[in-house]
């Protein structure tokens, strides 16, 4: 039994859902998202509540039930509130700047890294060492933030690199002399 899959999704004001043969479109104040769901999951929209049902308790249907509900809920939250990931940079000379929709990063390499914003994603640079990635699609926001982090992930000896705000970086002790 999927406990997450059985939860009811309540639609906030201004959000509407259309289900066309398991291709679900969610419209809200921040935008519109469309996603195709598995044919075995039945999506019912009743008033301002959405429920997902599976035809039987086969292993395949159980695994997809909770995931489908979580994906649909993320779509509803995305078009009503949006998602954001905050990153911070640690290191001498590490800085970020915005050039149009492009994020230009100086992270201790011989060249600057440029990251083009994917469709639906916006970058903000509140200070030279912090980056905010925001958008309505949770998956794309997370993937973009992870890509930026991968350009210079935090190293354990000095802690230099790009990390999520609040991320704990395990530190190691350096080599000891004789």
Swiss-Prot record:
Pfam families in the record: Ribosomal_L6
One GO cellular component term: cytosolic large ribosomal subunit
Gene Ontology MF terms in the entry: rRNA binding; structural constituent of ribosome
Biological processes annotated in GO: cytoplasmic translation
Keywords, ordered alphabetically: Ribonucleoprotein, Ribosomal protein, RNA-binding, rRNA-binding
Annotated signal peptide: none
Superkingdom, natural source: Bacteria
Keyword Ribonucleoprotein applies: yes
Family: Belongs to the universal ribosomal protein uL6 family.
Subunit structure and binding partners: Part of the 50S ribosomal subunit.
Function statement: This protein binds to the 23S rRNA, and is important in its secondary structure. It is located near the subunit interface in the base of the L7/L12 stalk, and near the tRNA binding site of the peptidyltransferase center.
Identification of the protein by name: Large ribosomal subunit protein uL6
Organism: Streptococcus thermophilus (strain ATCC BAA-250 / LMG 18311)
């Amino acid at each position: 039994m999927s406990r997450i899959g059985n939860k009811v999704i309540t639609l906030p004001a201004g959000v509407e859902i259309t289900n066309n043969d398991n291709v679900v479109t969610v419209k809200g104040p921040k935008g519109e998202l469309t996603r195709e769901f598995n044919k075995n999951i039945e999506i019912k929209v009743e008033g301002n509540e959405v429920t997902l049902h599976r035809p039987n308790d086969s292993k395949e249907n159980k695994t997809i039930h909770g995931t489908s509900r979580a994906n649909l809920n993320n779509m509803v939250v995305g078009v009503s509130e949006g998602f954001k990931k905050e990153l911070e940079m640690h290191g001498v000379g590490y800085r970020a700047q915005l050039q149009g929709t492009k994020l230009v990063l100086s992270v201790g390499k011989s060249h600057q890294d440029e990251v083009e914003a994917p469709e639906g994603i916006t970058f903000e640079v509140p200070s030279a060492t912090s980056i905010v990635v925001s958008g309505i699609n949770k998956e794309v926001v997370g993937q973009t933030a992870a890509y930026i982090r991968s350009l210079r992930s935090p190293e354990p000896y000095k802690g230099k690199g790009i990390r999520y705000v609040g991320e704990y970086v395990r530190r190691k002790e350096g080599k000891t002399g004789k």
